[in-house]
């Protein structure tokens, strides 16, 4: 093994150094403080769990993203968490077991087998909130509003929010009666927004059929006006689709009222999380970045696998990515340099200052250190027997 092999990190894995580490931690604290001011209680799930609980209700995508290992105590397969949402659902359904509304928030590292996008690598710092026990639109609005507030705290300008509803695609596919291979191919083409491929797969579908509506729907996206286009395409399709469109319209009206500065859009090809989302889904974007900076939605069925079905909605985001994209000012106050003198009065002054300030104490063998190189803009100086703080010239 060469010397370089000893310090080389795996692809997509990085050390986070000062001052970036300080900016990330500052935002993490502010995001969690914001969530807790909205009534969300902090939970700290374990880094590893048995695969059965990590994959509950999440579909195949999360399994591909999860590092797996064998438990040396039991021989069972375990996984390093790739998403904390299933863990929060387990805590609500089984560990807490509360009736009524439960609000939980979390923040911590997750590990992915492959990077999802260039800003995160394979070790994102995920934060999120989950609201359990309410299937109301008010709960959906609370979660979306909190997500937008956390993005404001992160200093993200000019937000765009896309809304979608899983029931629309789900109902059309059910009515179409595709075989398994065709359904998988249509899903893949819709997720990639490949209109030519959908035309090839569904080109023989007659007007008015579910397949024909899917082809037309893939061409619809944009602002509030696109909702009217979708209504025209989906007119008479099913009661479930009408209800989903009505809900999208109501939520859009509330968002326009409460967040007029956020541009709204509808993306009827949005299928991320289709395997576990059950209703309204949403994703926030910023100009110049193609991936969502935060996303979430309703997932009412996931708790049933833990023995207690509960309506649920929530969102998650990556703190590391937000720091890279945001315009949040970060200015760490300068520290105070204290000499290495063995003086009881100096010890008392340092102890008092450390209640509110950062004090860096010199060591006997670093008397030549320049305090400004250690981030100090002030120093403790003995003036007539009194230790006072003075600005470093």
UniProtKB/Swiss-Prot annotation:
Example GO biological process: L-histidine biosynthetic process
Subcellular location as annotated: Cytoplasm
GO molecular function, one term: histidine-tRNA ligase activity
Keywords: Amino-acid biosynthesis, Cytoplasm, Histidine biosynthesis
Spans traversing the lipid bilayer: none
Domain of life: Bacteria
The organism's taxonomic lineage, starting at the top: Bacteria, Pseudomonadati, Pseudomonadota, Gammaproteobacteria, Pseudomonadales
Pathway where it operates: Amino-acid biosynthesis; L-histidine biosynthesis; L-histidine from 5-phospho-alpha-D-ribose 1-diphosphate: step 1/9
Entry similarity comment: Belongs to the class-II aminoacyl-tRNA synthetase family. HisZ subfamily.
Gene3D superfamilies: Bira Bifunctional Protein, Domain 2 (3.30.930.10)
Quaternary data: Heteromultimer composed of HisG and HisZ subunits.
Main location class: cytoplasm
GO-annotated cellular components: cytoplasm
Stated role: Required for the first step of histidine biosynthesis. May allow the feedback regulation of ATP phosphoribosyltransferase activity by histidine.
Protein name per Swiss-Prot or TrEMBL: ATP phosphoribosyltransferase regulatory subunit
Other information: This function is generally fulfilled by the C-terminal part of HisG, which is missing in some bacteria such as this one.
């Amino acid at each position: 093994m060469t010397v370089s092999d000893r310090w080389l990190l795996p692809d997509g894995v990085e050390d986070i150094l000062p001052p970036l580490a300080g900016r990330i931690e500052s935002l993490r604290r502010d995001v969690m403080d914001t969530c807790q001011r909205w009534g969300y209680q902090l939970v700290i799930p374990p880094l590893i769990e048995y695969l059965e609980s990590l994959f509950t209700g999440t579909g195949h995508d999360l399994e591909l993203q999860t590092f797996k290992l064998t438990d040396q105590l039991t021989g069972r397969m375990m996984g390093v968490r790739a998403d904390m949402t299933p863990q929060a659902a387990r805590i609500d359904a089984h560990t807490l077991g509360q009736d009524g509304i439960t609000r939980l928030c979390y923040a911590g590292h997750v590990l992915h087998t492959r990077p999802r996008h260039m800003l995160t690598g394979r070790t994102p710092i995920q934060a999120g909130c989950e609201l359990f026990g309410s299937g109301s639109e008010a709960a959906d609005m609370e979660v979306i509003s909190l997500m937008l507030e956390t993005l404001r705290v992160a200093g993200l300008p000019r937000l765009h929010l896309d809304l979608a509803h899983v029931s629309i695609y789900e109902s059309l596919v059910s009515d179409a009666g595709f075989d398994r291979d065709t359904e998988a191919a249509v899903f893949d083409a819709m997720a990639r927004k490949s209109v030519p491929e959908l035309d090839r797969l569904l080109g023989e579908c007659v007007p008015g059929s579910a397949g024909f509506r899917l082809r037309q729907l893939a061409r619809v996206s944009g602002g509030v006006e696109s909702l009217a286009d979708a209504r025209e395409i989906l007119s008479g399709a099913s009661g479930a689709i009408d209800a989903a469109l009505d809900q999208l319209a109501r939520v859009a009206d509330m968002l326009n009222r409460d967040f007029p500065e956020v541009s709204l859009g509808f993306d009827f090809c949005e299928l991320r999380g289709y395997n576990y989302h059950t209703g309204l889904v949403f994703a926030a974007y910023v100009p110049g970045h193609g991936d969502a900076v935060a996303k979430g939605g309703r997932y009412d069925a996931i708790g049933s696998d833990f023995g207690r079905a509960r309506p649920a909605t929530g969102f998650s985001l990556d703190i590391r990515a937000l720091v890279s994209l945001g315009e949040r000012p970060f200015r760490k106050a300068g520290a105070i340099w204290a000499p290495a003198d063995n003086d009881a009065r100096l010890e008392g002054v340092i102890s008092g200052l450390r209640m509110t300030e950062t004090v860096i104490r010199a060591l006997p063998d670093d008397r030549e250190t320049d305090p400004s190189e250690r981030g100090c803009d002030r120093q403790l100086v003995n003036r007539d027997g009194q230790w006072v703080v003075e600005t470093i010239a």
